[in-house]
């Protein structure tokens, strides 16, 4: 398995903590050179990069100029994992509805598009590549006010991935979506009381959330599969059962 991916470059956006960190560790374990992208939190990103023998690169992926510079610096990217997101709970009181919409869409959708676009160009030239986009259970659920822009961005990501799948297929490039449910990250643990967490898990048929490592393992399995493209794969313990 290490030989299969040895020397390939994997770029993980939002790679400094939580699921992003687990993804970086999983691809490094497979022999990849790992690029840990981050917007904020240099120390955390550098710690992950040091742990996996990779490189931490700061980039606001909502800026096309910044994304282009990042890809110029990194060189050929074989595997892109679009994991970065704007946290729906980080909205500040002074932000207008329009400003918040732009902030969420800028990272969660535009950023995924820009990174996918620049990655795909090189992948097509080398006739091999993997695009994986991390979505959410919220892409399927009727959103409340807090989650409206987040849910819309994640749902649109599904169409974006199918477009990339169509464009990349003649060149051996695949594009898929992984839509996890509840992931038991440190952020989730700090935000939910034990009672709230128990209530969340009670609504999941399998009765639990997933660990970041469990999701990262499954993400790697998707990337390994060269005959899978244009698909949306759910990993949520039965919280949403696709028809």
Describe the residue ranges of each PLM region.
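Catalytic Tyr-X3-Lys loop
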Residues: 86, 97-114, 128, 132, ...
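Conserved glycine-rich cofactor-binding loop
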Residues: 9, 16-17
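Conserved mid-core segment of classical short-chain dehydrogenase/reductases
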Residues: 85-102, 145-149, 189-192
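Amphipathic alpha-helical dimer-interface segment in Rossmann-like NAD(P)H-dependent oxidoreductases
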Residues: 107-128, 165-166, 170, 220
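C-terminal substrate-recognition "lid" of short-chain dehydrogenase/reductases
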Residues: 128, 211-235, 240
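Short, flexible catalytic-loop segment of classical short-chain dehydrogenase/reductase
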Residues: 140, 179-190
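Catalytic loop of short-chain dehydrogenase/reductase
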Residues: 87, 132-156, 161-170, 182
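The beta1-alpha1 cofactor-binding region of Rossmann-like NAD(H)/NADP(H)-dependent oxidoreductases
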Residues: 42, 58-69, 98, 213
């Amino acid at each position: 398995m290490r030989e299969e991916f040895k020397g390939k470059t994997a770029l993980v956006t939002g790679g400094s903590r939580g699921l992003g960190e687990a993804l970086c560790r999983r691809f490094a374990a497979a022999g990849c050179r790992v690029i840990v992208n981050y917007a904020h939190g240099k120390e955390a990103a550098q710690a992950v990069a040091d742990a996996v023998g990779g490189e931490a690169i700061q980039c606001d992926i909502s800026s096309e100029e910044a994304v282009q510079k990042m890809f110029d610096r990194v060189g050929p990217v074989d595997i892109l994992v679009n994991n970065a997101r704007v946290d729906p709970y980080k909205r500040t009181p002074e932000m207008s509805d329009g400003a918040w919409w732009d902030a969420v869409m800028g990272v969660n959708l535009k950023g995924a598009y820009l990174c996918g676009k620049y990655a795909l160009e090189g992948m097509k030239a080398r006739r091999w590549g993997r695009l994986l986009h991390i979505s959410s259970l919220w892409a399927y659920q009727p959103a409340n006010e807090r989650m409206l822009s987040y849910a819309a961005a994640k749902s649109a990501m599904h169409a974006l991935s199918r477009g990339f799948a169509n464009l990349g297929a003649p060149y051996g490039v695949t594009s898929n979506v992984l839509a996890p449910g509840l992931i038991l990250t440190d952020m989730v643990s700090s935000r939910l009381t034990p009672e709230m967490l128990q209530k969340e898990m009670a609504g999941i048929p399998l009765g639990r959330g997933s660990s970041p490592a469990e999701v990262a393992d499954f993400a790697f399995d998707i990337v390994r599969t060269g005959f899978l493209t244009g698909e949306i794969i759910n990993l949520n313990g039965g919280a949403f059962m696709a028809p």
